[in-house]
Amino acid sequence: MPFIYINTALAYSMSLLGLLIYRSHLMSSLLCLEGMMLSLFIMMTTMTLNMHLMLMYMLPIILLVFAACEAAVGLALLILISNLYGLDYVQNLNLLQC
């Protein structure tokens, strides 16, 4: 297994571990999710380039589009919660129900 695959798998697992540890704060959770998306992007890009799969060249770009949408929605929720409550705890998401 090449060295870059080991590094990206380690980065993904560290981001997942950070997400599990710091799940009470929304900002920390969003940063860990972005780290997971970045490591997935690097892994998918290297795999498509190494295997020469022509049909999968657009897949990492689609992943980046979904990651950008996820980040935008997460930051909008973070700003909304911070303005309403002054804290970024995930428990405040339950208070936003209509």
UniProtKB/Swiss-Prot annotation:
Tell me the compartments it is located in: Mitochondrion inner membrane
Tell me the function of this protein.
Answer: Core subunit of the mitochondrial membrane respiratory chain NADH dehydrogenase (Complex I) which catalyzes electron transfer from NADH through the respiratory chain, using ubiquinone as an electron acceptor. Part of the enzyme membrane arm which is embedded in the lipid bilayer and involved in proton translocation.
Q: Show the taxonomic lineage.
A: Eukaryota, Metazoa, Chordata, Craniata, Vertebrata
Record's PANTHER family? Answer: NADH-UBIQUINONE OXIDOREDUCTASE CHAIN 4L, NADH-UBIQUINONE OXIDOREDUCTASE SUBUNIT ND4L
Q: Which UniProt keywords apply?
A: Electron transport, Membrane, Mitochondrion, Mitochondrion inner membrane, NAD, Respiratory chain, Translocase, Transmembrane, Transmembrane helix, Transport, Ubiquinone
Tell me which GO cellular component terms the UniProt record holds: mitochondrial inner membrane; respiratory chain complex I
The membrane topology of this protein is: Multi-pass membrane protein
Pfam families, per the entry: Oxidored_q2 (PF00420)
Describe the reaction catalysed, as an equation. Answer: a ubiquinone + NADH + 5 H(+)(in) = a ubiquinol + NAD(+) + 4 H(+)(out)
Assembly with partners or alone? Core subunit of respiratory chain NADH dehydrogenase (Complex I) which is composed of 45 different subunits.
Segments spanning the bilayer are: 1-21, 29-49, 61-81
Indicate the segments annotated as coiled coil, or none if absent: none
Main location per the UniProt record: mitochondrion
Q: Say which species the protein is native to.
A: Cebus albifrons
Name this polypeptide is given: NADH-ubiquinone oxidoreductase chain 4L
Task: Please give the biological process terms from Gene Ontology that the record holds.
Answer: ATP synthesis coupled electron transport
